Amino acid sequence: MAFLKKSLFLVLFLGLVSLSICEEKERETKEEENEQEDDNREEKRFLSLIPHVISAIPHVVNALSNLG
């Protein structure tokens, strides 16, 4: 009977350990996906600013030419 209890505890322990490892890998995968999404959002924000910067260049050039 004691052998059966020890075996059952061992099986439960190993099952919990493997479950914990799987959950940790899943968590890491989700974190990596979130980081990639954040990077994509930042890139899109940057790209949306380019037309505004380009349209501001003539104003900056005019302001600099008026100073000189």
Swiss-Prot record:
Record-listed Leucine amide modification sites: L67
Alphabetical GO biological process terms: defense response to bacterium; defense response to fungus; innate immune response; killing of cells of another organism
Chief site of localization: secreted
Coiled coil: none
Signal peptide residue numbers: 1-22
Tissues expressing the protein: Expressed by the skin glands.
Cell compartments where the protein resides: Secreted
Top-level taxonomic group: Eukaryota
Residues of the propeptide: 23-45
InterPro entries found in the cross-reference section: Frog_antimicrobial_propeptide, FSAP
Keywords: Amidation, Amphibian defense peptide, Antibiotic, Antimicrobial, Cleavage on pair of basic residues, Cytolysis, Fungicide, Hemolysis, Immunity, Innate immunity, Secreted, Signal
One GO location term (cellular component): extracellular region
Family of the protein in this entry: Belongs to the frog skin active peptide (FSAP) family. Phylloseptin subfamily.
Function: Weak cationic amphipathic alpha-helical antimicrobial peptide with weak activity against Gram-positive and Gram-negative bacteria and fungi. Has been tested against E.coli (MIC>217.69 uM), S.aureus (MIC>217.69 uM), K.pneumoniae (MIC>189.00 uM) and C.albicans (MIC>217.69 uM). Shows a moderate hemolytic activity.
Protein name per the record: Phylloseptin-SP1
Organism of origin: Agalychnis spurrelli (Gliding leaf frog)
